[in-house]
Amino acid sequence: IVSFYGDNPIISENLSKLEKKQFTSTVEILKQYEKEKRILFGGTFSKKKLKISPTILRTKLNETDILQKELFSSLLPVVGINDKESALKQISQTSKPLAIYLFGGNKKIHNHISKVTSSGTICINDVMLPVLIPNLPFGGVGQSGIGKFHGEEGFRNFSNQKSITFKGFLFDSNLRYPPYERVKKFLKFIFQI
């Protein structure tokens, strides 16, 4: 973070400012974590500049509010999970996430988690790739969103595929209209052939 933003991220031109309402709600979260001494890194902010330094928050598993909320800020809540079973249990107890981000080199664990979980995306050892690859569909499933965007999938999801049918006037089968005895006789004849 220091190599990206320097020793004081608040004065960095590379750190975006927040919209005022978003800044205020994010600072409230930050103050609560500061009070509980659960800021692992960062935590500085400037009301004048509407900036919050990149901040890592030590979060508990039962704090579903911050873990499921879209923060749209530089806060990163993290939960330490010791093993694969605990991670799977946590994922299965919550609604389907927009994305699951896995870090580590064990391909067996990656494959297993991919098979037994449901999410919009799984990203391994990165957090940006799913939105940086233009033709890769990205989006949620269930409560995290419906449909995908990016590339061809995005075009399909944001387009209205309209069905148009046309029937001419020259031929109009009376099999479509009551009484349906004629239809039954016709179908019996067809299926006997």
Description of each model-found segment:
Residues 1-62, 124, 186, 191-192:
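ALDH superfamily catalytic-core signature
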Residues 1-2, 52-193:
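Conserved C-terminal structural/oligomerization subdomain of aldehyde/semialdehyde dehydrogenase
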